[in-house]
Structures are given as C-alpha cells and as structure tokens.
Curated annotation (Swiss-Prot):
GO-annotated molecular function: UDP-N-acetyl-D-glucosamine:N-acetylmuramoyl-L-alanyl-D-glutamyl-meso-2,6-diaminopimelyl-D-alanyl-D-alanine-diphosphoundecaprenol 4-beta-N-acetylglucosaminlytransferase activity; undecaprenyldiphospho-muramoylpentapeptide beta-N-acetylglucosaminyltransferase activity
Catalytic activity, EC: 2.4.1.227
UniProt pathway: Cell wall biogenesis; peptidoglycan biosynthesis
Listed name of the protein: UDP-N-acetylglucosamine--N-acetylmuramyl-(pentapeptide) pyrophosphoryl-undecaprenol N-acetylglucosamine transferase
The gene coding this protein: murG
Chain positions recorded as UDP-N-acetyl-alpha-D-glucosamine binding sites: T9, G10, G11, N123, S176, Q274
Compartment(s) of residence: Cell inner membrane
Function: Cell wall formation. Catalyzes the transfer of a GlcNAc subunit on undecaprenyl-pyrophosphoryl-MurNAc-pentapeptide (lipid intermediate I) to form undecaprenyl-pyrophosphoryl-MurNAc-(pentapeptide)GlcNAc (lipid intermediate II).
Enzyme class: transferase
Recorded family membership: Belongs to the glycosyltransferase 28 family. MurG subfamily.
C-alpha cells in the first residue's frame, strides 16, 4: 500500500488528488496523511479516493521563532513516530510527499523508518522542507528545469480547454483561500470592464464573499461571485482571460485549459517563488506578470484590452502534458 502526504492549501492537495486517482485507477490502495489545519479535511475527509485518511495536529515551522519553533519541531518528531504505527498497520511500502507543512510527519517518518520516499516539488523554487528531505528521497519530481512539463493535473482541465478568440469574459482568481488584493483590483476594474461589455467571474474566498457581492451590487455591475468551487474548470471554460496569483497548481491548470492569464504573484511567498513559477511563461510570451507593489490599474486595463489572447491560447495548448500523473506514477511503481 502507498501513502500520500501533504497539503495545507489547494495547490498541494490538487497534486495529491491527481496522483491518488492515477494509483486507484491502477488498482492500488492509497491512504492519506494530512493535517487538521488548512484545507486537508475539506478536500478529503469524505472522499472515496483514499482507503484510509489520517489528519494530525501538525503545524508549519518556517515562520515560527524561538521556543515556538522548537515545540513545532518536537511535535513533528512525535507525529513521525505515530506514522510508524500507520505504516505497520497498512503495510506501507512507499510515501509520496506533495509538500506543505502537512507532509512533514509522514515524510520524516518515511526517512526514519526506511520507507521509500518520493517527493513532488510543485514550485520553481524548492521549499525548505523539500530541500532538507531531497537527499533522502528515492526520487524527486519537479516540472521545472525539464524538457517536458509533466505536472499532475486533473484531466477535466484539458477536457474543458478551448482556444480563445475574443475577450468577452474575465475571471479573477485569488487562489483556494481568496486574495484581498485581487478582490480589490477586480472591483476597481469592474466599471471599466462593464463599459466594454466584458463579463466578470470572480472567486473571492469565503472571508470577503458578502462584502464583494455587495460592492458589485452598489456599482450596478452584474458579476458571478463565489468563494470556492470544486468545479473551477467550468468557470475557466467560460472565460477568455484570467487575472490570478501564480500558485503552481493554479498556473498549470490555467495552462491545461489554454486560458490566457495575467499573473500577479503573491509578493510575500517564500523566495518569491510565485514569480519564478510564472517566469517561463513570460519568457515565452505566453503570459503577462505584474508585481503587486506599485501596480497601475490603468496600465493593466490597457494591457487587458490589447492582449493577443488568441495567440497566447494557441501557444498554451501543448505546453503541459495531459499525462503528468501517469508519468510520475509509472516512475514510482518501477522503483
């Protein structure tokens, strides 16, 4: 049996889901080891993809200091030993880590108790946990720095892809938890977009859902506003342009959907990794990147109206393999 571990945010969990589905389709039994914090339970507590699911009281370490960091590290070690019981009970031979603080206990447990550890790094810049564990893993997967981009993406994003020809609808994405800056930007652009007959679809996160809806209503702008959706590909398919953060899973899903995107990387992401996630698209003239600090909405709006969405959409069609999960699982099962 194989264990998949990691999560915290939608980006990590999307990879866990894609790899688990591929394993299940091959008749493999899979368990999930995640955290009580973050979105792990929301994604998988009632999912039938995994044979068994475990959610630990794990916490991030990177942003903690002093005694709080020490306690967090001790908690990871304690939970790693708890994983030993899970490994034994389910005869776990391999652990696949998809990153995030949720992955720490089972990943360290795999190293300590000599289980095969496989790591998928989703970002262009390695996270600290993956950097520490890389020398001890059986195989390290990254979709950056390779000739083919084999990021594990749900096939639904490919199935709903289309080439865009005309800007009729714009999608604002703030990630699985929403983003205040993206929300504010969307509202600031709303009247200009309305005046050019451009429809708005806006994922704003749960915290600002009612406020965002109220502000659109006050302006007299009809917009599709929602907090979170398990069918985000439906909204992508309806859209001709996206404005989004540059979290890895969202970025690759947008590529798979051939949806032209203007990325505004989260400026406080570790090592500015969101900028580097999207840089290869910028270098290939397949995306625009704006820095959040000092962004001029008038310049951005001009770019929105002048962007050649057809050529970008055409260029995105074949940039990522639809068989990313298959390619990765093939390599894991051969080890």
């Amino acid at each position: 049996m194989i264990a998949i571990t990691g999560g915290g945010t939608g980006g990590h969990l999307a990879i866990a889901k894609a790899l688990a589905i591929e394993l299940k389709n091959r008749g493999e039994n899979v368990i999930f080891i995640g955290s009580n914090s973050g979105q792990d339970r929301m994604w998988f507590e009632h999912s039938d993809i995994f044979k068994f699911k475990y959610f630990f009281p794990s916490r991030g370490v990177v942003n903690k200091k002093g005694i709080h960091k020490l306690f967090a590290l001790l908690n990871i070690i304690k939970l790693a030993f708890k994983c030993r019981c899970i490994f034994t009970e389910h005869n776990i031979s391999s652990v696949i880590s998809v990153g995030g603080y949720s992955s720490a206990p089972a990943s360290f447990g795999a190293v300590i108790f000599r289980k095969k550890l496989f790591i998928h790094e989703q970002n262009a810049i390695k996270g600290k946990l993956n950097s520490i564990l890389k020398p001890f893993c059986k195989k390290f997967f990254s979709s950056y720095g390779t000739d083919t981009y084999d990021y594990p993406i749900d096939i639904k994003f490919f199935n709903t892809a289309r080439v865009r020809n005309e800007l009729k609808t714009i999608l604002f994405l703030g990630g699985s938890q929403g983003a205040s800056f993206i929300n504010s930007l969307a509202l600031n652009l709303a009247l200009n977009l309305k005046n050019h007959n451009i429809n708005i679809i806006h994922q704003c996160g749960a915290k600002e859902l009612e406020t965002t809806r109220s502000k659109y209503n006050e302006m007299g702008v009809e917009a599709v506003v929602f907090d979170f959706s398990n069918e985000i590909e439906v909204y992508m398919q309806k859209s001709d342009l996206c404005i989004s953060r540059a979290g890895a899973s969202t970025l690759w899903e947008l590529c798979a959907n051939a949806l032209p995107t203007i990325f505004i990387p989260y400026p406080y992401a570790a090592s500015n990794h969101q900028f580097y996630n999207a840089k290869f698209l910028l270098d290939s003239n397949l995306a625009k990147i704006y820095e959040q600090n000092g962004l001029d909405k008038n310049i951005l709006f001009t770019d929105i109206m002048n962007l050649d969405i057809n050529s970008i959409s055409m260029g995105l069609r074949n940039i990522v393999s639809p068989n990313g999960a298959k390619i990765i699982i093939d390599k894991i099962l051969k080890q």
